[in-house]
Amino acid sequence: MTFLSGCYTSSTTSGNIPLKYYLGVATPANYQTVVKEVLLENNYHIENYENNATSAQIITRWNIRAPYPAETDAGFFDSKTRIFITAIIDNSTFSKNNGFSYECYMQVLNLVYSGRDREYVEFYNVPLLKSEMDHIAQSLSENFTNNK
């Protein structure tokens, strides 16, 4: 089940489902400025900007942190989170002066480690992480417009 709250779409299904959000529509200028500002306010630092002919992506560094209670309850003792903000060019918005708009999305990669398999695994059934990511998505979407 999905609901629209503010300018972002959030999944309300429980379980180990990846966190993905629709953020709204941005210009190239406010996309980079707003994303950088909101991520820094939430202790996420940009590691990489990737651009191609149809999209732009901002990728954070891994936020290595103490596991949340839901992660320790599941037997994990190490956790790290990374955010991807993707902006896809809306071709219908091109203008004479090269202006255009982006459709913006956020995806979260949360990895945890238990030591059993000697590798990190994705884990999303973490209420505190979801709350934190909902807050970041809401903060971003408040600075974009919602045309969906």
Positions of predicted regions on the chain:
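Ser/Thr-rich, low-complexity intrinsically disordered terminal regions
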Residues: 8-148
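C-terminal motif of bacterial Sec signal peptides marking the signal peptidase cleavage site
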Residues: 3-6
